[in-house]
C-alpha cells in the first residue's frame, strides 16, 4: 500500500495532490466534481501523473511558502538543484466582496544550480 504523504494545493474550486517525490497524482479539473485528469493515486498503470524522473541520489523535500497555498518541492543532489512550485490562484474581486477562482494549476520549475538530470 502507498503511503498517503501528499502535499495539496487548491483554490476552493478544486485541488491537486502532489506526492513527496513531486508528482501530481490526483487532480479533478476544473472542479471537485469533474472527472480526474491525473489519477495515479488510484491506479498506477492507468491513472496518469505529471512529475519528474530523477536519479536515486536526489534528496527531495517539501514545504509550503509561508502563509500561502504554494507547495515547494526541492530536488537536491551533487549534480544540481532545482525547485518546483505548485499553486492554484485565488483572486479577490476588485470590489473586495468575493473571489475569482480560475481553473488554473501553475507549475513553476526554477533551476538553482548545477546541471540537474
Regions found by a protein language model. Give the residues of each.
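Beta-sandwich/jelly-roll carbohydrate-recognition scaffolds of carbohydrate-active enzymes
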Residues: 2-20, 24-117
Amino acid at each position: 500500500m502507498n503511503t498517503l504523504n501528499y502535499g495539496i494545493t487548491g483554490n476552493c474550486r478544486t485541488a491537486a495532490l502532489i506526492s513527496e517525490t513531486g508528482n501530481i497524482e490526483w487532480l479533478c479539473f476544473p472542479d471537485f466534481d469533474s472527472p480526474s485528469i491525473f489519477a495515479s493515486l488510484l491506479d498506477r498503470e492507468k491513472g496518469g501523473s505529471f512529475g519528474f524522473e530523477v536519479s536515486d541520489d536526489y534528496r527531495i523535500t517539501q514545504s509550503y511558502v509561508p502563509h500561502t497555498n504554494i507547495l515547494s518541492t526541492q530536488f537536491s543532489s551533487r549534480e544540481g538543484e532545482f525547485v518546483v512550485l505548485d499553486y492554484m490562484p485565488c483572486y479577490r474581486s476588485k470590489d473586495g466582496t468575493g473571489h475569482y477562482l480560475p481553473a488554473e494549476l501553475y507549475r513553476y520549475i526554477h533551476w538553482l544550480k548545477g546541471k540537474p538530470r
